[in-house]
Amino acid sequence: MAKYHFIIIGSGWRALYYVRVAKALPEIFCIDAMYCRTQEKADLIAGQYQIHTTTSIEECVAYKPDFAVVAVKKDAICDVSMEWLDRGITVLSETPAALDTDSLNKLYSYYKCGKKQVVAEQYR
């Protein structure tokens, strides 16, 4: 079985759950990169978790991942998800997918165009 290659957008506690899942199941998942907004955060995460981190969106896209995990602040998750859908990348986003009906309808329009987004919920 081929591994699923993915990138992670975000570096908070929810994003780090996906790092732990990938490390627990290396025969199934491979993290190509974690996108961080600052180099300081990227260096910190890379050192703590021994994964590749970057501040370059272009680098993340160049990996041609099977999907992108979007685990950012809830007020940004819809817009960030749409940015990655616009790049042609399937999105696995954390909840909430959107904060209002208009934003949810925008996400639905991506589905109608054949773009894929899956929403996940995790509990501590």
Language-model regions, residue ranges each:
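N-terminal Rossmann-like dinucleotide-binding module
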Residues: 1-49
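Short alpha-helical
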Residues: 13, 40-41, 75-76, 99, ...
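Beta-loop-alpha module in the N-terminal Rossmann-like domain of NAD(P)-dependent dehydrogenases
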Residues: 49-110
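Rossmann-fold dehydrogenase core element
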Residues: 105-122
